[in-house]
A protein has these predicted regions:
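"A position-specific structural signal for the A-helix of alpha-solenoid helical repeats
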Residues: 5, 10, 69-76, 112-120
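Amphipathic alpha-helical binding modules
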Residues: 81-123
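Mid-chain, well-packed structural core segment of small domains
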Residues: 61-85
C-alpha cells in the first residue's frame, strides 16, 4: 500500500503541471508511474481489462487500486500527448468503468471522472 500512496503523490505532481509547458517533467513523471507499476503504456492500452487486473495485482490484491492509478495516469498523459489522446482517454474510461463495476465500494469520484472523460471524448 505504501507504493500506491507514493504513486498517488507522483500523480498529484502530474496533475499540478497538467497545463504547464514542462513536457520533460511530465514525461518523466508518466514514465515513473508506468515503471513503478511494472507495465508499459502499450501493454496498458492493449491488454484486456481482466488480464490487466491480474498483472497489476502483484499478489497483494491491490490490482483495482493500481488500475485506477493507470487510468488517472492515462487521463493526465492525454493532456500532454495529443497524438494518442483519444486512445488514452478511451482506455482510461474503460478501466474506470470496469473498476466501478468490480469494486465493492461505490465511488462518486470515479463516476465524475468517467463523465469528465466522456465529455473530453465528445468534444
Amino acid at each position: 500500500m505504501v507504493q500506491i500512496e507514493e504513486l498517488g503523490k507522483v500523480l498529484a505532481q502530474l496533475f499540478d503541471i497538467r497545463h504547464d509547458s514542462n513536457d520533460g517533467k511530465s514525461e518523466s513523471l508518466i514514465d515513473t508511474l508506468y515503471t513503478s507499476l511494472k507495465i508499459d503504456k502499450h501493454q496498458a492500452l492493449t491488454m484486456d481489462l481482466e488480464t490487466l487486473r491480474i498483472k497489476l495485482d502483484q499478489g497483494d490484491h491491490a490490482g483495482l487500486q493500481r488500475m485506477e492509478l493507470i487510468a488517472k495516469t492515462m487521463l493526465e498523459e492525454s493532456f500532454h500527448n495529443s497524438i494518442e489522446a483519444r486512445a488514452l482517454l478511451t482506455k482510461a474510461k474503460d478501466i474506470l468503468t470496469y473498476i466501478q463495476k468490480s469494486d465493492q465500494t461505490f465511488s462518486l469520484e470515479r463516476v465524475e471522472l468517467i463523465d469528465f472523460i466522456s465529455n473530453l471524448l465528445n468534444d
